Curated annotation (Swiss-Prot):
Function: General (non sugar-specific) component of the phosphoenolpyruvate-dependent sugar phosphotransferase system (sugar PTS). This major carbohydrate active-transport system catalyzes the phosphorylation of incoming sugar substrates concomitantly with their translocation across the cell membrane. The phosphoryl group from phosphoenolpyruvate (PEP) is transferred to the phosphoryl carrier protein HPr by enzyme I. Phospho-HPr then transfers it to the PTS EIIA domain. P-Ser-HPr interacts with the catabolite control protein A (CcpA), forming a complex that binds to DNA at the catabolite response elements cre, operator sites preceding a large number of catabolite-regulated genes. Thus, P-Ser-HPr is a corepressor in carbon catabolite repression (CCR), a mechanism that allows bacteria to coordinate and optimize the utilization of available carbon sources. P-Ser-HPr also plays a role in inducer exclusion, in which it probably interacts with several non-PTS permeases and inhibits their transport activity.
Top-level division of the source organism's lineage: Bacteria
InterPro entries for this protein: HPr, HPr-like, HPr-like_sf, PTS_HPr_His_P_site, PTS_HPr_Ser_P_site
Sorted UniProt keywords: Cytoplasm, Phosphoprotein, Phosphotransferase system, Sugar transport, Transcription, Transcription regulation, Transport
Listed name of the protein: Phosphocarrier protein HPr
């Protein structure tokens, strides 16, 4: 299992567009990928799960990936978070 923590810097947090990008990216991988915020974990392949967390600015999140392509999944998600301006 791999994990990576991030601080969200976007003023609006993880809103619809970047959430969609994260879900689409996570869905490309076979690994089980979870997003944790405020002690609650959701499947990162579920747009409803991601949006239900209400992740805002300055939030600390952790991504967990477990499976054959876990390292690639974490890297791809890190790239999306950076490209979407959610993290530095």
């Amino acid at each position: 299992m791999e994990q990576q923590s991030y601080t969200i810097i976007d003023e609006t947090g993880i809103h619809a567009r970047p959430a969609t990008m994260l879900v689409q990216t996570a869905s490309k991988f076979d690994s089980d990928i979870q997003l944790e915020y405020n002690g609650k974990k959701v499947n990162l392949k579920s747009i409803m799960g991601v949006m239900s967390l209400g992740v805002g600015k300055d939030a600390e999140i952790t991504i967990y990936a477990d499976g054959s392509d876990e390292a690639d999944a974490i890297q791809a998600i890190t790239d999306v978070l950076s490209k979407e301006g959610l993290t530095e």
